[in-house]
Amino acid sequence: MAEEGAQKATGKIKSVVLILSGKGGVGKSTVASQIALELANGGNKVGILDVDLCGPSIPRVLGLEDKDVHQCADGWIPVYADKNEKLAVMSIGFLLRNSKDAVVWRGPKKNAMIKQFLSDVVWGDLDYLIIDTPPGTSDEHITVAENVRGLNLTGAVMVTTPQAVALGDVRREITFCKKVGIPIVGIVENMSGYTCPNCSECTNIFSKGGGEALAQLTQVPFLGCLPLDPKLTMSIEDGKSFTELYSESPTALAIREIIRPLITS
């Protein structure tokens, strides 16, 4: 019954993609937002759902902090990030009186809110629904896994950084996905080197290649590397699409390579 309710409220969704990370601070929401923006730039109808209830970042990275969600007879109407209404957004950040308020909830209340997000948002028909999840593995992840089974789940994109501690956490995330039956689209290594804003040369300030090595070890596809790019940071601060502003940059090309399996799946 929950699955039927989700389909009725959300409309037809062709592909659901989860964005996961084993730990916080690896740029998961940045990757989620850039995937959603690039898919929308390609003419797709895209929704992005922020279920990181205690740390909602999507309104900030898309420049939508001052927006409000409205209700209709069928549920919540999402916020649109563009005039053409190609990118719809839903986050608990839109429901807080003050965007800086802390969400201090126990597990059952968080799970109830996630279920409501997955059943009561009036997306309309979507080509893609990108779900930005909290870091780690918790009750919230189990709730998401249980409630997307009735939808067209393409799988999960894992976001990590090159450091060993982040890679270890992602390995546990991969185990979680296998246990709950979530297909894995692949691994993205974020913050993989620093791109100079003047000459575009990439310098490895952390270790490099850990994400690809982990992908080989766990037999999971490796989707590519994203460097620390000051221009990407600036575009996020302005709530703009990086791939539109810097379409020929190495980072933009890397983002397009990352979404290729989502388009062809």
From Swiss-Prot:
GO CC, any one term: cytosol
Residues given in the record as [4Fe-4S] cluster binding sites: C196, C199
Keyword Phosphoprotein tagged: no
InterPro entries from the UniProt entry: Mrp-like_CS, Mrp/NBP35_ATP-bd, NUBP2/Cfd1_eukaryotes, P-loop_NTPase, YlxH/NBP35
Compartments, as annotated in UniProt: Cytoplasm
GO BP terms in the entry: iron-sulfur cluster assembly
Keywords from the UniProt entry: 4Fe-4S, ATP-binding, Cytoplasm, Iron, Iron-sulfur, Metal-binding, Nucleotide-binding
Chief location bin: cytoplasm
Necessary cofactors: [4Fe-4S] cluster
Record note on cofactor: Binds 4 [4Fe-4S] clusters per heterotetramer. Contains two stable clusters in the N-termini of NUBP1 and two labile, bridging clusters between subunits of the NUBP1-NUBP2 heterotetramer.
MF GO annotations: 4 iron, 4 sulfur cluster binding; ATP binding; ATP-dependent FeS chaperone activity; iron-sulfur cluster binding; metal ion binding
Residues the entry annotates as binding ATP: G22, K23, G24, G25, V26, G27, K28, S29
Stated family: Belongs to the Mrp/NBP35 ATP-binding proteins family. NUBP2/CFD1 subfamily.
Stated role: Component of the cytosolic iron-sulfur (Fe/S) protein assembly (CIA) machinery. Required for maturation of extramitochondrial Fe-S proteins. The NUBP1-NUBP2 heterotetramer forms a Fe-S scaffold complex, mediating the de novo assembly of an Fe-S cluster and its transfer to target apoproteins.
Quaternary context: Heterotetramer of 2 NUBP1 and 2 NUBP2 chains.
Protein name according to UniProt: Cytosolic Fe-S cluster assembly factor NUBP2 homolog
Organismal lineage: Eukaryota, Metazoa, Placozoa, Uniplacotomia, Trichoplacea
